[in-house]
Amino acid sequence: MSQYRVFVEKKEMYATEAKSLCHDLNENLHLSLTNVRTINVYDVFNVNGQEIETAKQNVLSETVTDIVSMSLDLEGKTYFAVEFLPGQYDQRADSAIQCIQLLTGNDEVRVKSGKVIILDGIASEVEIEKIKQYYINPIEMREKDLQAPLSFDENVEIEDVPTYEGFIDYSDELLNNFLHEHGMAMTLDDIKMIQAYFRKEERRNPTETELKVLDTYWSDHCRHTTFETLIENVTFESGRFHDILQQTFEEYCMMRERVHHNRKPMTLMDMATIAMKEQRKLGSLNDLEVSDEINACSIYIDVDVDGETEPWLLMFKNETHNHPTEIEPFGGASTCIGGAIRDPLSGRSYVYQAMRISGGANVLETVEETMEGKLPQKIISKRSADGNSSYGNQIGLPTTFVREIYHEGYKAKHMEVGAVVGAVKASDVRREKPEAGDIIVLLGGRTGRDGIGGATGSSKAHTETSIQTASSEVQKGNAPTERKIQRLFRNGEVTRLIKKCNDFGAGGV
């Protein structure tokens, strides 16, 4: 078995990506480039001569539109090459591997992808560096060395999960230092509670995995701890809206008395859910499905199916991906819609419609006006739109409402909201409690380095250096795999076997 490097470039009449990039660089960086070429690079491993020929002709290129070569003349040319960071999910490479395996029967084939950018009309080294800074987002990619020997090293040394010896005896000062050293999102009070539990109940020190899981699922991203902040001493400033705000607040206080007799603390979460709880108490939400599964809002509806009325479940879910989209727009926006789909999908429903609402600052401002430590607003706006569109197109989901709001406040952080609706026949769903001996299935794509710590990363305060230090906290979307799960769950024989199902997102640990 051998290894090969294949270069694939669009013929001039089809080189829309290269022409678009040339226009983009000239307009936004005030350059005078005369031409740009973009060449996809495939490093293919563990194949023989016949298999690489099959891959070149049938997988890596299209005969009508592409030029394929095993070498690339870069003599005297100004260029740079890029590739994904090690461990990042590379959908182009993954798709190539699957196709080559299907065509050749070779299960050992491996592929890495990259891209070469050739620039004509560069006046200085300063311009090259300017282009690299604009094009390369260090969160997801790096420069590729075309002179380095081909290598594909998937070997990972699996170490024993460490136990934090002495943890249950740490002082408050040591616990606080521990939080900072391990980059955790939880508070000192959180970790003190964990320490007390392990000291009194488990009578042992915790492992790294146990603390990481708790840090993830206790994070603001997962548990919305910000909305549980206690609200005290509420007053309203005098002004145009004083009376209506005061009246609304008093109505809320009366609802609290009617619903739970003020036994629960006043929080933003209580404000957000109190109306629904009152409606349910009054018997106005009898169509709401209530279960132990916390996936998506689910209500019972009657559906006319070929003239006969059938009970179905209609599910709604929305998700924000503000932080991920701010630092890696394409991946953040694509996994926003992907994550929103995953929740009603976990409820066994088929998601058939979506909407996207986003918020950005002035997308017309120049690159030079970009705040330090942030991506240009136009980059965030364009690439996030591409990410949402890419994921939706691949999974086959129509997005029937799209709106981007522009306000200077979104310069602090981009807003990315995805919302979906799905449905499933009620008789194809069962909600039961798991029991000892039940089979547990973990279903989905392979986990890469991307996305690890995503939930806790979204829950921490961010600084000017966040874009350099959060390199693994934005997951790469894998729409084809989620589409396979969607198709599997459309089979009632499958869903009727499932007692309980929950989305296992938030990036992993």
Which residues does each PLM region occupy?
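Functional cores that coordinate and move charged inorganic groups
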Residues: 486-509
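Core nucleic-acid recognition elements
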Residues: 1-462, 467-481, 488-496
